[in-house]
Amino acid sequence: MRRFSCIVGSVFLAMTQAQAELVINGSTISSNATVPVVTSEDYTPNNNFQSCLANLRSQAIAAGVSGATYDRYTQNLTPDYSVIDKLNYQPEFSTPIWDYLSGLVDEERVELGKQKLAQHRDVLNRASQTYGVPPETIVAVWGVESNFGDISGKYPLLQALGTLSCEGRRQSYFRTEFFATMRILQRGDLTEDQLKGSWAGAFGHTQFMPSTYERLAVDFDGDGRRDLVSSTADALASTANFLNKAGWQTGMPWGFEVKVPQGMSIDGEGRRSKH
């Protein structure tokens, strides 16, 4: 999931489930956070991108991408430096959470979620029985991640992830996703045209990152392919599988709204810091 990373063990897990509950229940939580600002003006398109891709070739091969596959998909690859701006202006971290969530959940989306719940009831029930995740939660994640498949992203994954593999923060992370995208293409699971998504590389109905797709996507419609782009059944079941593997426990709350004690510093807090 976008950032399709959700519940137990990470901030993303908690946020996605929080958003999932919001689509169904319409409740909200609060937070404030910012990230350092670096813009695409700091990055000038030049031969460094091709040099970077050439240097990454051996890493890709070590990660299971054939030389032929790598060469095919990088030969004419060009950078998209607009993703550098996106990397540094993520609304989850720069927008107060009340404002962020109010933009994700409104009456129209809740109503559409109810319609999708009824429309896909059979598949959702099967997925729920298989993975132990309520249909309502699966649909809620679907709504938050792509507005039920209507907005799944327009960025070509290879271009976006290739750029992020060579420029900006978290290059090591994005290289992992870049290579995973190539392995998906190498296996023939999806086509290059299908692999369009968010600036960060998330794609499909519920915005899986490529490495998450490799680990947790399932073929639920029985056609022999794990297609999270064109198959609603595969996407919804894969979402349930994701939450199941993340430690989903039906009936347990995703978290609680709290007030930070006066004088308590939250500088440096993150997913690995606990109190």
Language model region names:
Residues D42-L53, A63, G67, V110-R121, ...:
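Solvent-exposed, acidic/flexible segments
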Residues E192-H275:
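Flexible, glycine-rich surface segments
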Residues S102-Q115, G168, S172, D189, ...:
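Substrate-binding clefts and substrate-entry loops adjacent to catalytic sites
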Residues E21-T130:
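An acidic, Gly/Ser/Thr/Pro-rich helix-cap/linker signature
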Residues Q159-L185, D219-G224:
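Acidic, His- and aromatic-enriched active-site or binding-groove loops in soluble protein domains
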Residues A60, T69-Y81, G132-G149, T181-I184, ...:
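Short, functionally critical alpha-helical segments immediately adjacent to catalytic or ligand/cofactor-binding
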Residues R2-Q19:
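Gram-negative bacterial Sec-dependent N-terminal signal peptides
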Residues P79-K86, S146-Y155, E167-Q171, R187-D193, ...:
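Secretory-pathway/luminal and periplasmic proteins that interact with or process carbohydrate-rich
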